[in-house]
Amino acid sequence: MLSPKRTKFRRHHRGKMRGVATRGNKVSFGDFGLKTLEPGWLTSRQIEAGRRAMTRYTRRGGQLWIRVFPDKPVTIRPAETRMGSGKGSPEYWVAVVKPGTILYEMKGVTPEIARSAMRVAGFKMPVKTQFVVRDV
């Protein structure tokens, strides 16, 4: 699963997900892409589940790019802990996505297979997604 090798700070603020994606919103490597339609957090497990579903569907055909990276740590406090005594310890990593962010790109397969594979991966995501084709 994806996670940073090292970070400057161990804990992050939760932040706000306002507006639409201005970067990472175009299909730039492959011919087909999976685009988000709403804001959300994608965990490294969800990103990996989508990748596995697509590679399994395409039977390792074509080429696949993952365009998002989970670089935000999410902290969780232990169960039945009293308030105070600092922030919890980092438990997992998330990628913050805005509407319009391209999650995956694919090349080297037919449009029908790409659409079906992206649809399978979209079911694994916590946000609504859409299949997009590269603008020529």
From Swiss-Prot:
GO terms for cellular component: chloroplast; mitochondrial large ribosomal subunit. The keyword Cell membrane does not apply. It comes from the Eukaryota. The keyword 4Fe-4S does not apply. GO terms for molecular function: rRNA binding; structural constituent of ribosome. Transmembrane segments: none annotated. Keywords: Chloroplast, Plastid, Ribonucleoprotein, Ribosomal protein. It holds the Pfam family Ribosomal_L16. InterPro entries: Ribosomal_uL16, Ribosomal_uL16_bact-type, Ribosomal_uL16_CS, Ribosomal_uL16_dom, Ribosomal_uL16_sf. It is found in: Plastid, Chloroplast. GO terms for biological process: mitochondrial translation. HAMAP family: Ribosomal_uL16. Part of the 50S ribosomal subunit. NCBIfam families: rplP_bact. Belongs to the universal ribosomal protein uL16 family. This is Large ribosomal subunit protein uL16c. It comes from Mesostigma viride (Green alga). The lineage of its organism: Eukaryota, Viridiplantae, Streptophyta, Mesostigmatophyceae, Mesostigmatales.
